[in-house]
């Protein structure tokens, strides 16, 4: 009987004080929720990416003392903005020519960047809590779409280039959980393009991606330490080696 009366109180406190209970997070993580079902049916490539990111981020957050269930939930929804233009994202291009072939670098960058804005709009339409929308806002921080920016620079050598045209709107991560999601998202996505899967390649990939994010000051507003980041790197490397069935070769 007490449990029955407790549920309305939980929702009341969440509305009044802006926090989310584990009960609410577990509900949002349910793969049968309308938005996650739409994600899995319409863009299965992005859905699988989100699942892998959720697994990476959850384990890392648990290890460094963050809210593992919160980051898992945020990870499941972070890319919902891709629903509007699924074919422009590599994980959804199965054996087909990329539609970016018909666009210039600025147009391509605009579409890629817009998945963050679209994601926020969709999240609000489905009444997702602000704490989950924060993961959508921050998962690219203020980084650039490096591939299209690099192509643009090659095409416009000697010209003054406005890099802001290729930059995500931010904000940068402002908590352990949002910082971990940014790392997990970039590492998981980049791991799919490795030409060779071995311990050296995975080590180099994880270090390069996260060190670049550090160099771009993406984590200066989050309460994450270098010790935390080293722990996160170790977990990502171990997880990726398991995912890609990499065997560790021991010296004879």
Q: Which stretches of residues belong to each language-model region?
A:
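Divalent metal-dependent catalytic cores for phosphoryl transfer on phosphate-bearing substrates
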Residues: 36-49, 54-199, 203, 212, ...
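Short, mixed-charge, low-aromatic patches
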Residues: 6-16, 31, 72-79, 161-166, ...
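In a subset of proteins, long, contiguous C-terminal domains/tails are tracked
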Residues: 13, 17, 42, 190-252
